[in-house]
C-alpha cells in the first residue's frame, strides 16, 4: 500500500522470530520486518499509515539515516517518490 500511495519506491518484508521483554516477561512471537525505501520527507506519513494497520500498541517504526549508497539507485528512488 505504501508503494501504491507513492510514499515508498520499494518495500521488503521479512518473516522473523522475535524475542522481547514485554509486560514483565520474555515473549516470543512470529513477526515481519518491513523495510521501506523512501525519502526522509515521507517518514511522518508512513508512520501514520503503519500505525493505522499495525496490530501492536507500540510498533517499532524507525528512521535510519543513509550515509552512502548506489547513486543510480538513489536517483531512481528520488524519481519514484520525490
Language model segments and positions:
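Positively charged, small/polar-rich N-terminal and surface patches that mediate targeting and assembly
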Residues: 1-82
Amino acid at each position: 500500500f505504501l508503494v501504491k500511495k507513492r510514499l515508498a519506491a520499494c518495500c521488503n518484508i521479512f518473516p522473523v522470530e522475535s524475542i522481547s521483554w514485554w509486560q514483565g516477561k520474555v515473549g516470543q512471537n512470529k513477526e515481519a520486518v518491513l523495510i521501506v525505501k523512501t525519502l526522509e520527507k515521507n517518514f511522518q506519513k508512513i508512520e501514520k499509515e503503519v500505525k493505522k494497520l499495525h496490530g501492536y500498541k507500540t510498533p517499532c517504526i524507525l528512521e535510519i539515516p543513509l550515509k552512502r549508497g548506489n547513486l543510480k539507485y538513489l536517483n531512481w528512488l528520488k524519481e519514484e517518490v520525490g
